[in-house]
Amino acid sequence: MSTESKCPFAGGAYANTEAGAKGNRDWWPKQLNLDILHQHSSLSNPLEENFDYASEFQSLDLDAVVKDLHALMTTSQDWWPADFGHYGGLFIRMAWHSAGTYRIYDGRGGASRGAQRFAPLNSWPDNVNLDKARRLLWPIKQKYGRKISWADLMILAGNVALESMGFKTFGFGGGREDIWEPEKDINWGPETTWLGDERYSGNRELANPLGAVQMGLIYVNPEGPNGNPDPLASARDIRETFARMAMNDEETVALIAGGHTFGKTHGAAPASHVGLEPEGASIEEQGLGWKNSFGTGVGKDAITSGLEVIWTPTPTQWDMSYLETLYGYEWELTKSPAGAHQWKPKGDAGAGTVPDAFDAKKRHQPSMLTSDIALRTDPAYDKICRDFMAHPDKYADAFARAWYKLTHRDMGPITRYLGPLVPKEELIWQDPVPAVDHELVNDADVEALKAEVLASGLTIPQLVSTAWAAASSFRGSDRRGGANGARIRLEPQKNWEANQPAELAKVLAKLEGIQQKFNGAQQGGKKISLADLIVLAGNAGVEAAAKKAGHDVKVPFAPGRTDATQEQTDAPTFAPLEPKADGFRNYAKKGLEDAAAYLLIDKAQLLTLTAPEMTVLVGGLRALGANYGQSKHGVFTSRPETLTNDFFVNLLDMNTAWAKSEKAAGEFEGRDRKTGQIKWTASIVDLVFGSNSQLRALAEVYATSDSTEAFVKDFVAAWTKVMNLDRFDLKK
């Protein structure tokens, strides 16, 4: 018998642990990805289940952390020396790139989960050497432990970097909780190579929901589109990508000009000297990547972007020098030592005006990126730059506010912000709602109001659909939307196709009448908001439908929502929240019918639902008749508006044979196998609960004869969860 040792991987003994092993989605690429509904569970979180980060952060000596960060900025380490003796530029870039992945179309990305620590972000080409920034922060993270998350620390480090170089920031709010595994729900693009750009169609139209121009970039290619040094074309890319972060032209100029006031870029030699990124590097590198074989590999020999740019004469000081330099010279193309396109003053003007990052005896001329020259070339950006030069205080305020917005955009309302550095001013992009300034309804009021709603002539489908439309606008990604604020009665939500505007207006008018009658009859200032009444009315509909099925249930209700005004609502940035499809309502815009099942999973993930919660909600909402346009698709019951498990029972009935309908795309007909008569009609979303093996397993749970009570209980729990998704006041 051979005693020769062999690698166990070669024989496939541990193939299930190899990244290259084929998984189910390799065999069946079109399979639904339900994994995104179960990420970030307690099973991957090393902290105890009752860990309360908000309480830990509130007990933190934030002044001490800030003091330590200030000291870090100028304590250069030999293993990664500080440019100009100050790490400020590096930490600004780290914070910017942590926050800058946010995109408005689905609210994903951003700084609020500390995702830069994990793949793919930790290994993106645009994040080269930010692994070093996080390692520099590690002693501070180690010192304060669980009292400050990586997510908060990275943004705070960016703020302190700015402050330490003389800039006054707008404020800082803590409260970002770390995740412990990569985010599986984010579509970063279709490309399979770094810096690929298969995300365009037509005249360079960037696909939704993507926010960057190429795979692995935060925003734009600093050399210009695909490395083409065309400033006007670069300006177009800049405007598009920053708009996808909800930044206007003024905010865009302020961020670029303000950020490039500090530090430098690194391109000492060609990229051939740079090793693999952290996720691909050897084990002895211990999570670091991009090992550089040129010279010392660090300091003056560092290679990051391949560009070798120092923008200003004062790269560790806040001043007007970036704009003064940009407009102080005429610029011409040149190349960095790494061969990347960048710009220098014509005629070698400005020689000796810019310091060397490591040798006090050396001086250089300033240089710029194509994306910098774009600010001067584009007429709108140019006008803003000149205005900022004439009004330095306006410029500083614009940068402070834009930086605050950039780094806090995905945190939700200001009520979630923690710590003594939170500014008092509430801004429109934080989706403000009025504070409760009245006595709330009590249990007796709630019962009386539900009775009034049920006697109003409004149907169960109307009540349920309206509450669902309001609450399900919530996105767990950036904590926007939801029932609080009653924005369903405002632009743009009141006119969204999925909300059936004409029908919605009738329901809201009835509910407003009930609200006014109740509030007018109260003594002492007790009131119910329309936002509360919309949810309460939906609850009343669910309870009435459950009662028809023989179940006496009470749906939990917590008053305390208030009604926002149109002036408190940033209509343009709410527009991307409009659902393209909502499988819970059996709704899909024309042309998206075939993708409806995938979009259901995406919607469920944004609603923070698990697969069982999604399943029970779909089945229950079909029974309640909550379909868009009163469609009968998926209403597999002879007793509509009754909270039964009939959807699951009849979906799994083998006496029904399904076939595609010839009437419309994405529609199906269920016929009696014996008679051939049509029994039911369905959408792809309906049938996927019988087709997909995981969803069928869940459907079977709710189709059994002993599941009726569990079905109602689980539906009420999942319904209540959705109604309260934006009630951050209840979760403190």
UniProtKB/Swiss-Prot annotation:
Keyword flag Signal:
yes
Any single Pfam family the record assigns to this protein: peroxidase
Tryptophyl-tyrosyl-methioninium (Tyr-Met) (with W-96) crosslink location in chain = Y219-M245
Designated name of the protein:
Catalase-peroxidase
- Xref: InterPro entries: Catalase_peroxidase, Haem_peroxidase, Haem_peroxidase_sf, Peroxidases_AS, Peroxidases_heam-ligand_BS
What's this protein's family per the entry?
A: Belongs to the peroxidase family. Peroxidase/catalase subfamily.
The UniProt site entry described as Transition state stabilizer is assigned to: R93
Record has Signal as a keyword: yes
Annotated function: Bifunctional enzyme with both catalase and broad-spectrum peroxidase activity.
EC identifiers of the protein:
1.11.1.21
Briefly state the modifications made to the protein after translation. Formation of the three residue Trp-Tyr-Met cross-link is important for the catalase, but not the peroxidase activity of the enzyme.
Q: Name one GO biological process term.
A: cellular response to hydrogen peroxide
Q: Where is this cross-link: Tryptophyl-tyrosyl-methioninium (Trp-Tyr) (with M-245)?
A: W96-Y219
Task: Tell me where the signal peptide lies.
Answer: 1-15
Q: What does the subunit comment say?
A: Homodimer or homotetramer.
Q: What class of enzyme is it?
A: oxidoreductase
**GO cellular component entries:** cytosol
Molecular function (Gene Ontology), one example: metal ion binding
Q: Which residues bind heme b?
A: H260
